Amino acid sequence: MAQAPVADIFAGKYSVGQQVTVKGWVRTRRDSKAGLSFVALHDGSCFDPIQVIALNTLNNYADIQRLTTSCSIIATGVLKESQGQGQSLEIEADEIEIVGWVENPDTYPMAPKRHSLEYLREHAHLRPRTNVIGAVTRVRNCLSQAIHRFFHENGYCWVSTPILTASDTEGAGEMFRVSTLDMMNVPTTEQGQVDFSQDFFGKETFLTVSGQLNGETYATAMSKIYTFGPTFRAENSNTSRHLAEFWMIEPEVAFADLSDIAQLSEDLLKYVFKAVLAERADDMAFFAQRINKDAITRLEKVIEQDFVRMDYTDAIEILQNCGKKFEFPVSWGVDLSSEHERYLAEEHVGAPIIMQNYPKDIKAFYMRINDDNKTVAAMDVLAPGIGEIIGGSQREERLDVFDRRLAEMGLDQEDYSWYRDLRRYGTVPHSGFGLGFERLVAYVTGMQNVRDVIAFPRTPGNANY
């Protein structure tokens, strides 16, 4: 008999009295003096397990009484309305096949108790079996599907940009080098530098920090594209907001200015928040109960509110005059820290903010210079409860201005010759943004650390599994 997902059973896709087969892992087992056992089976398809009733008339009932957490079983039986509290349906088993035992349950790392998130990170290969990481995984999947659906419905083309690259999109130099050279016998040039001409690609190559530059090449032909893939930053940052490997969503739109891309960011966030509240109500209820009591209400507020547009210069004035003492002093020309962003979004406005027009000296080389020659057409979306969640800009499409910007930042034109071609052959105003997927998942779930919303976190000193 085909497997019946537990989620489908609870969704009413199977009728009471129908015989079903469920496959999964034991969460708990409770034995009754009346000669039966109650087995909570979980298959990952939804938050709740389904109760399987095993009568002592089953041939292998003695083995069933030995079941412990995470033993794998296949149970076939009749679906019934539950007489007990806490569940609406249960299965009275005609047969229970024990597929896999847990070796030495006393030392099993995921024993049925509440573990700290730090402990779970140390057992990342087993933590999907817990309520919290299982719920995170389903919400992450829901958000991913909703993002693809949003762009598909709005006429965007999904482009897979390269992971291996010779370009530094951010111009910050915090990149992972990729090489097949023998580290014990590195070839050198006459000047004593590493001779990358003998490397696999014949030049110095890195893991990508962003798909943006490659995405722009397709936006200037396909009009509207987006990328959704892994990116890498060699930042030695041990914080709750940073990962060395993470996923980014990066739309690029031709004939779009900063206002257009700001509206796109608002539309995207509202769309995916609506989707997760509708499709993962069980998991979101868990997060509201156990992780952050505002997990649901703050998403609802974002959906209902208009995002507030604010200029960076105005924000600095607000911060300087608010009377609040910040850890990091505020002045025009400094990058806003998380405490500044959260004050503005949570206390001053009480709604998401789209911060615009930042000083050019704190932003990347590809952002369009404004007429004041001091600021760039850049924007960040600041969300209450987390701060920056999206960063984007109108791209500099004027070749002469772009070349001056490269020179100002000490970047070599030759390294960006193909990128300059976009400005030489049919240049067009275009804009885009980057949305860090893990930060989005953390915001939605209320999880405080991005290491807990990605399967196997990569951080300084940690590349396990």
From Swiss-Prot:
It catalyses: tRNA(Asn) + L-asparagine + ATP = L-asparaginyl-tRNA(Asn) + AMP + diphosphate + H(+). The keyword Nucleotide-binding applies. PROSITE patterns: AA_TRNA_LIGASE_II. InterPro entries: Aa-tRNA-synt_II, aa-tRNA-synth_II, aa-tRNA-synth_II/BPL/LPL, Asn-tRNA-ligase, Asp/Asn-tRNA-synth_IIb, NA-bd_OB-fold, NA-bd_OB_tRNA. Keywords: Aminoacyl-tRNA synthetase, ATP-binding, Cytoplasm, Ligase, Nucleotide-binding, Protein biosynthesis. It holds the Pfam family tRNA_anti-codon. Its EC number is 6.1.1.22. Belongs to the class-II aminoacyl-tRNA synthetase family. Homodimer. This is Asparagine--tRNA ligase. It comes from Pseudoalteromonas atlantica (strain T6c / ATCC BAA-1087).
